[in-house]
């Protein structure tokens, strides 16, 4: 007789009792341990993790280089606050990121804690540099859950419900979406119209864009669109901010998504996979722009914590030593081909898209009108979990299934995930 009692139901009741409903947990699981691209819950069941803590674990769970770096740093300095005293991991990380992003140009970096905090500080820096106040963001974009981050985010539900009034002088314009009929030319014309009718270019401090929209549905901005945006911002003295919080650190096959377009942003926001699971974010940008705020204008008690900076340095080392950029690109192609095979058999998969190892399926109710099917998406997510695969949804209509597996995922795990997804599709469609 098996006397083992599952812990999960009790722990989920504890979660419901003591954690507010506004903090959604996508899967009714309680995790005990993790390694690489795998998780085990408190009852011992194994799952393939194709969420990666929502894109935080490009390096995988508990990478040995990251674990060793954090353990070593913990023996020296765990926290000191950079506004009080400097410490070497912060300085070394700032130099490496500036060299990675800026090349031979003079760049500087400031570190914070969360992605939303990096976005807010990027806007502050842009406003200080230009002495302008307006900001343009994109429909479907996601830039965090703080009040300014929510204002910049181009989706209403659930992020903006009952949280207003929002920050002033933030404007939204269409993002290219070939599947929904929005070309680069159409998006650029809409931006021109915005500048002609709602806010003059000489009042715009910054334009902020994700090179691949994350929560908005894994839409990749075409190269020509990013290049045109760079030309427009240079013409009008507008700071171009690339939000690389989800796309950075190998997710698209390059260090950063903007590198596919061959452009040089003014400011870049980084977070998520930067520190391999530890809380760390940053703004990296041209030195003249980064130095615009007065002394004391930037900061944060935990920003650039010594443990997180040590972890980030280990992440960069691991990427270079293990050729993870090339690996991610190869894994992305393997996953893409598998998803295309599924699409060929199921018309409900309207689109397979993304960049590198940042891929998604868009699910629809009918092939002609392409009506979003959020219900099918949720049922597929639930069925995949039962089969041992964790994935989550995104998209303005929540009908997009996204994949954010670690770059250390094996080919066998990719194939296993595709097999689980295939079976889950068959069950929910029948």
Each model region followed by its residue ranges:
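Conserved N-terminal phosphate-binding loop of PLP-dependent enzymes in the Aspartate aminotransferase
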Residues: 2-430
